[in-house]
From Swiss-Prot:
Compartments (UniProt record): Membrane
Region (Disordered): 1-21, 44-63
All ranges on the Cytoplasmic side of the membrane: 1-24, 274-379
Extracellular side: 46-252
Keyword Glycoprotein (UniProt): yes
InterPro entries in UniProt: Znf_RING (IPR001841), Znf_RING/FYVE/PHD (IPR013083), ZNRF3_Arkadia_E3_ligases (IPR051073)
Source organism of this protein record: Mus musculus
Entry protein name: RING finger protein 215
Disulfide-bonded cysteines: none
One example GO MF annotation: zinc ion binding
Lineage of the species this protein comes from: Eukaryota, Metazoa, Chordata, Craniata, Vertebrata
Source organism, top-level taxon: Eukaryota
Keyword Mitochondrion (UniProt): no
Annotated zinc fingers (RING-type), start-end: 327-368
Transmembrane annotation, as ranges: 25-45, 253-273
């Protein structure tokens, strides 16, 4: 097939543009689970450690009305830890301080409430025992009082902790079926303690308030002693095991939230890895990116240049006449019906000869006119 029968040069399809660089926001996605963890369920509003929601029972605010002989009634506030299922039983009865009570003479037959006390001396001893120890210990006096209250059949346990700094370091148990009330420190707590130390007969009624289980952290801690809880003098009720290790059971909502955070972290990690791979591939293609862009510009320019078919007289079909124009690239004569490329400088060449030249040089072979711009080359 001769050059005259070749089809006209078509603009080649442009290669796809390089992929856009990854958004910088993708690099911030791994911080999303951390932000969700701080804003989600269990986050502490005061900057302290978030609540873990451990233990089977919920925490509810309570009001304790204490009646003392020949004195005004004392109103105390605190937190009750107990089972959330079903209506809560009404708590009330005589208050007995376990540190000074005589079990054989003062334990009443009807329901009564045990009072456990941790004073400044016990707290100081507690901190001294914990210094240099990697394993957490608890105030021995409080543990002994709680054990004694369980075995003597107390219907509830009232904790008087004058120094509440120990509450953050002490795991407070809901003691199975026996609710625990932790009182907030106030002047009335001091008055109640003074009355109980003087063996003044006091009674209390406990009424519940709204749920605080989402804001307060409580942990279920068991000890290593088992026995039967006594329900007055008439018999034995409930097997109580104070034993072993700390049970850590999270609420279903907290477990679901942890699963959501885990999935979000995995998705964010995958997106970051994909963005890094895409950026790596783009960096590998970067050295040739400018060259490809320049070639596409030259191809578009060639497609816009004029072409024409060579028309010779019949006499010049057989032998070229003297003075017939030639292609300055291949030095061959122009033949009839050949495709010629007409440059902006009006010079003509064989299209198949000058196009490869222009792809490399971008200038007219005769006058050095730059086909990409309206100026002449300095070469």
């Amino acid at each position: 097939m001769g050059s005259a029968d070749r089809p006209a040069l078509r603009s080649p399809s442009l290669p796809p543009p390089p992929p856009s660089p990854p958004s910088p926001l993708l690099l911030l996605l791994p911080l999303l689970p951390l932000w969700l963890g701080l804003m989600g369920p269990g986050a502490a509003a005061d900057g302290s450690e978030p609540a873990t929601g451990e233990g089977r029972g919920g925490a509810r605010s309570v009001r304790v009305d204490v009646k003392l002989p020949r004195q005004d009634a004392l109103v105390l506030e605190g937190v009750r830890i107990g089972p959330e299922d079903g209506p809560e039983p009404l708590l009330g009865g005589r208050l007995l301080l376990m540190d000074v009570v005589d079990a054989e003479q003062e334990i009443p037959v009807d329901g009564w409430i045990a009072v456990a006390y941790v004073g400044k001396e016990q707290v100081a001893q507690f901190h001294q025992e914990n210094q240099g120890s990697s394993q957490k210990a608890y105030p021995k006096a409080l543990v002994q009082q709680m054990r004694r209250a369980l075995f003597l059949g107390a219907s509830a346990l009232l904790l008087l902790i004058l120094n509440h700094s120990v509450v953050r370091e002490l795991d407070v148990s809901q003691l199975l079926l026996r609710p625990v009330i932790v009182l907030h420190y106030s002047s009335n707590v001091t008055k109640l303690l003074e009355a109980l130390l003087q063996r003044t007969q006091a009674t209390a009624e406990i009424s519940s308030g709204e749920s605080l289980s989402a804001n307060i952290e409580w942990k279920l801690t068991l000890w290593t002693t088992c026995g039967l809880s006594k329900d007055g003098y008439g018999g034995w009720q409930d097997l109580v095991c104070l034993g072993g290790a700390q049970a850590q059971e999270q609420k279903p909502l907290q477990q679901l939230w942890n699963a959501i955070l885990l999935v979000a972290m995995l998705l964010c990690t995958g997106l970051v890895v994909q963005a890094q791979r895409q950026a790596s591939r783009q960096n590998q293609q970067e050295p040739g990116g400018q060259e490809d862009l320049f070639k596409r510009r030259v191809v578009r320019r060639l497609a816009s240049l004029k072409t024409r078919r060579c028309r010779l007289s019949r006499a010049a079909h057989s032998l070229p006449e003297p003075g017939t124009e030639t292609c300055a690239v291949c030095l061959d004569y122009f033949c009839n019906k050949q495709w010629l490329r007409v440059l902006p400088c009006k010079h003509e060449f064989h299209r198949d000869c000058v196009d490869p030249w222009l792809m490399l040089q971008q200038t007219c072979p005769l006058c050095k006119f730059n086909v990409l711009g309206n100026h002449y080359s300095d070469d």
